């Protein structure tokens, strides 16, 4: 009789442990899903920051160019190299963009 009760106790413990393992797996799965969602949100936030940064850079590049164009349109003689060099700014902008793309790649 004791051996039957011992066997029942062992089976009950085994089933309890199996259920706990399944619950742990489910919890880990949920944590994994939450972590993936958090990573996606972080990536989205970084992409938004990079986009805003790129817009600010483009405005900084286009601002001096626009000033030169307006000055020329108003009849002033303007040496564009004293204000800006388009190739220099384009190269800088592209270098920064590439570095950000490489930084946030998967």
From Swiss-Prot:
Pfam families: Vesi_VP2 (PF05332). It comes from the Viruses. It is found in: Virion; Host cytoplasm. InterPro entries: Vesivirus_VP2 (IPR007996). Minor structural protein that forms a portal-like structure at a unique three-fold axis of symmetry, following binding to the host receptor. The virion attaches to feline junctional adhesion molecule A (F11R). Once attached, the virion is endocytosed. Acidification of the endosome induces conformational change of capsid protein thereby injecting virus genomic RNA into host cytoplasm. The channel formed by VP2 may allow the delivery of the viral genome through the host endosomal membrane. Belongs to the vesivirus VP2 protein family. This is Minor capsid protein VP2. It comes from Feline calicivirus (strain Cat/United States/Urbana/1960) (FCV). The lineage of its organism: Viruses, Riboviria, Orthornavirae, Pisuviricota, Pisoniviricetes.
């Amino acid at each position: 009789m004791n051996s039957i009760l011992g066997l029942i106790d062992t089976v009950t413990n085994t089933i309890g442990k199996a259920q706990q393992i399944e619950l742990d797996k489910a919890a880990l799965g949920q944590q994994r899903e939450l972590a993936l969602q958090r990573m996606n949100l972080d990536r989205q936030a970084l992409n938004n920051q990079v986009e805003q940064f790129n817009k600010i850079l483009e405005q900084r590049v286009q601002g001096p160019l626009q000033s030169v164009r307006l000055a020329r349109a108003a009849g002033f003689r303007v040496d564009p190299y004293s204000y800006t060099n388009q190739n220099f700014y384009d190269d800088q902008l592209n270098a920064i963009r590439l570095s950000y793309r490489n930084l946030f790649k998967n």
